[in-house]
Amino acid sequence: VNYIRVMKIKLFILSLFLSSNFLISQTNSKKQFLVNTIAFYNVENLFDTINDPKTRDDDRTPKGRDKWTNIIYQKKLKNIAKVIADIGSDLTGSAPSIIGLCEIENINVLKDLINTNSLKEENYQIIHYDSPDERGVDVAMLFKKNRFQLTSSKTYPLYLKRKNGSIDYTRDHLLVSGYLDKDLIHFIVNHWPSRSGGQMRSEPGRILAGKLNKKIIDSILKSNPKANIISMGDFN
């Protein structure tokens, strides 16, 4: 399957058997497949405690509505890291080779996450771009550099128009391409507009997000009709 679409979920796990990367046993001719776990996780407002005047993050500050102290922040990091470390470990013995994330405030929280006790030995690398989302949440990807060779990454902005003609800035789509072991795979990380305000009112935003996703996929398939594409995310 070249294109895997994941519908609305908070945590998605895919154990990928790479058929082109099998190992031949010296004692018999059985194929032994390399297994990679690929996951997506909506970490639900992973914010640091620092107030960013450019975004609406006031609730996630020590004096904000959520009383977002460093103790609470560190606890959230620890809990998320434990979940990630356990994903697919029964098959691979380690954390996922690739994990897409959404509701990330900035690159600093990603650095804090990969340096937790549960993940610091996994040697994760970060792919992140600041998006124009008004709440300040972004999508991102973590990958193990010993399993994934990055070739390119790019963001695609999604602009929604309000009734008064102004622009509603939301999350970008993130495209990451590279070799997972020896297979070239393209990953699209999504976080589509929510149903805030009701499904009917918010549906046009998700339709535009779907069209943008298809545009990205079509551009890849135009270059290689047999390209391996995984589109992951919270599709709301």
Named regions from a protein language model:
Residues L34-T37, S94-I98, E121-Y124, D181-I185, ...:
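Loop/turn elements at helix/coil->beta-strand transitions in domains of secreted/extracellular proteins
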Residues R195-N236:
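Flexible, glycine-rich surface segments
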